[in-house]
């Protein structure tokens, strides 16, 4: 099977128009006519990940976070991104990224988190009024426009966040410990612990602070996400339990989503979940 067939399968599952307007999901590096020798699935593409792909005989890397995000002005040896690009090109390794299109897809990143927390059929939110997109970023570049990189503007994305209902209410401290255990997180940053039980849980992998008002309006008892701006913690004690577990920790099971899509849609393609830990943050 050719790399382009794997790419097409991934984009059927998480169409590129689902990505935010500032994103750069899709093909990053390489030629897609080559036969797939193996697909290495990862959260981030680093030099170590490329080395692992070589070692494990994979000529395709599928990541969640794009390697090429803010654009390259040169391909030399000035930083880790440039070195990673050069290494992948030299070794004829194709790099594909499924980022906010996978975040926003039905059965994507947030559904996987819900599955980890014990619910396989979480609810998607009702259509929300227009608001800003996830994060702050510059407008599309001419090259992105030429490649058809678009966002969905103010339309609701099906998986931008999801709501699950726990089988039984949990005391807040027990809930936080449960999330840490299920998501393999070392710690969690929270606001004041709730005095009432938690049962309705909103989920957004990665940086989800832009959704806080939405999940409160939807009646969530708790909000599990990967990043939260300091000032967002203020003013919500006893209104909602904020549970921030780290960007990497909230998304590192995304490789299982990618694996399931490829194995279902591209039978015979060998999938390897990367063993390289690319989390740049260390808790000391």
Listing of model-derived features with the role each one plays in the protein:
Residues 1-284:
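Hydrophobic structural segments
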């Amino acid at each position: 099977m050719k790399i382009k067939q794997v790419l097409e399968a991934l984009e059927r599952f998480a169409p590129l128009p689902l990505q935010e307007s500032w994103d750069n999901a899709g093909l990053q590096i390489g030629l897609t006519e080559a036969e797939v020798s193996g697909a290495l699935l990862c959260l981030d593409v680093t030099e170590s990940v490329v080395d692992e792909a070589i070692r494990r005989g994979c000529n395709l890397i599928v990541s969640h976070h794009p390697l090429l995000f803010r654009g390259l002005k040169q391909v030399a040896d000035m930083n880790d991104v440039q070195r990673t690009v050069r290494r992948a090109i030299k070794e004829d390794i194709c790099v594909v990224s499924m980022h906010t299109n996978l975040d926003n897809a039905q059965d994507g990143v947030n559904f996987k988190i819900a599955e980890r927390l014990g619910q396989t059929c979480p609810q998607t939110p009702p259509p929300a009024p227009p608001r800003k997109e996830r994060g702050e970023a510059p407008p599309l570049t001419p090259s992105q426009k030429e490649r058809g990189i678009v966002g969905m503007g103010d339309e609701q994305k099906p998986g931008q966040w999801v709501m699950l209902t726990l089988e039984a209410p949990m005391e807040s401290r027990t809930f936080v410990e449960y999330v840490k255990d299920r998501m393999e997180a070392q710690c969690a940053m929270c606001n004041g612990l709730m005095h009432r039980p938690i049962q309705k849980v909103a989920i957004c992998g990665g940086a989800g602070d832009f959704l806080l008002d939405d999940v409160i309006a939807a009646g969530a008892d708790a909000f599990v996400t990967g990043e939260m701006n300091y000032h967002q913690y203020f003013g919500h004690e006893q209104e909602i339990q904020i549970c921030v577990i780290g960007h990497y920790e909230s998304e590192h099971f995304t490789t299982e989503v990618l694996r399931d899509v490829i194995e279902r849609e591209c039978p015979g393609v060998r999938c390897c979940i990367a063993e390289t830990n690319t989390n740049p943050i260390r808790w000391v």
